[in-house]
Amino acid sequence: MSDLLDTVRGLAKKTDSKILMVVLDGVGGLPLTVNGDTELATARTPNLDALAQESQLGQLELVGAGITPGSGPGHLSLFGYDPLKYVVGRGALSAVGIGVKLNRGDVAVRGNFATLGAGRLILDRRAGRPSDEKNAEIVAKLRAAIPEIDGVAVEVYTESEHRFVVVFRAPEGQPLGANISDVDPQVTGVEPKTAIANDPSSEVTAGLINTFVARAEVALADEPQVNGVLFRGYSDVPHFPSFEDAYQLKAACIASYPMYKGLASLVGMDVLPVEGHEDALEGKVKALRENWAKYDFFYFHIKKTDSTGEDGDFAEKVHKIELFDELLPQLLELQPDVIAVVGDHSTPSKLKSHSWHPVPLLIRSNYGRRDPAQRYTEEEAARGTLGLRHGPDLMPLLMANALKLNKYGA
């Protein structure tokens, strides 16, 4: 454990208070023009504004100054795990999130379906975000075309939209390495990269990846839009200290997308079933309400604030923020002792990608001070009395506000 996590573990105590952590994925943004507003500031959010007026605000750097967090490191940081110490690839998170069991030596990989043009140039890294039904159809094609490579069993799984997972099953006594460069260049207008092993133990896996990419393009050659694959986030089986053991909290995850459910599962949270598709807002509220008495801590995830930012759709990201604002009163009706609203990273529509900008943080509790803030925005958060903090500081703050930490020292 990191020093802070180990210290908190020694101070944590069980109480009846409840903590609700709302993660608006990628919520931080940028104005489109010099004097413009961010997506958060543009959105009409009367309920978030009212909550901000009863709260303390601040900012979090999830990994470190200038470092752009992936979703995995961003969430680990929010949960109190040092993301530089506890490292996991997106492949394992997605695999575990959809219920795939990984064995020692296996390697899981997160894939994107992509659109390739002449000369294999990437036209769209997400293939137009195909429907889940189309995703399943493409996965079936790949399963039929690539059941194994050089004696290594290959399993392909659907995730959602453009996302899929591939698991390479290690032969007996021959563990596969996962230290490999990404195939996904994360930009358009260039060819997919060649996977390169970063250590000798990963050379076989890199060869498997490159062979899969080539065979997939052959298998999908008749597809007008979903005709290529991009890989990133290779991972073997990760192990983390138990969230419950560290914080004395019985914790539940309410999320729709497999990667986030996978991460919650890996740290020991119970993943609650959610009715509905995509962000399934009402289904999430229902899951929260029906399980409120059973848990001390709830992780409540909203995805589309991130997806719309990655699409560069400023107006739609504003709309998704406003949809959450309409939902917020139903969360507050449950009267959590502590509620936090935060992002796992920023995803400005202007950049169409994750960014290094700090994420705005709001904490309301019965024992917290109030800031003069009028709204939950990046600008108000930058002036907040919580200041600019490292991501793993969040959980101790929530625990303290819930009166779940004993005093340190005499």
Curated annotation (Swiss-Prot):
The keyword Isomerase applies. InterPro entries: Alkaline_phosphatase_core_sf (IPR017850), ApgAM_prokaryotes (IPR023665), Metalloenzyme (IPR006124), Pglycerate_mutase_ApgM (IPR004456). SUPFAM superfamilies: Alkaline phosphatase-like (SSF53649). Pathway: Carbohydrate degradation; glycolysis; pyruvate from D-glyceraldehyde 3-phosphate: step 3/5. It is an enzyme of class 5 (isomerase). It catalyses: (2R)-2-phosphoglycerate = (2R)-3-phosphoglycerate. Keywords: Glycolysis, Isomerase. GO terms for biological process: glycolytic process. One of its GO terms (molecular function) is metal ion binding. Its EC number is 5.4.2.12. Catalyzes the interconversion of 2-phosphoglycerate and 3-phosphoglycerate. NCBIfam families: apgM, PRK04135.1. Belongs to the BPG-independent phosphoglycerate mutase family. A-PGAM subfamily. This is Probable 2,3-bisphosphoglycerate-independent phosphoglycerate mutase. The lineage of its organism: Bacteria, Thermotogati, Deinococcota, Deinococci, Deinococcales.
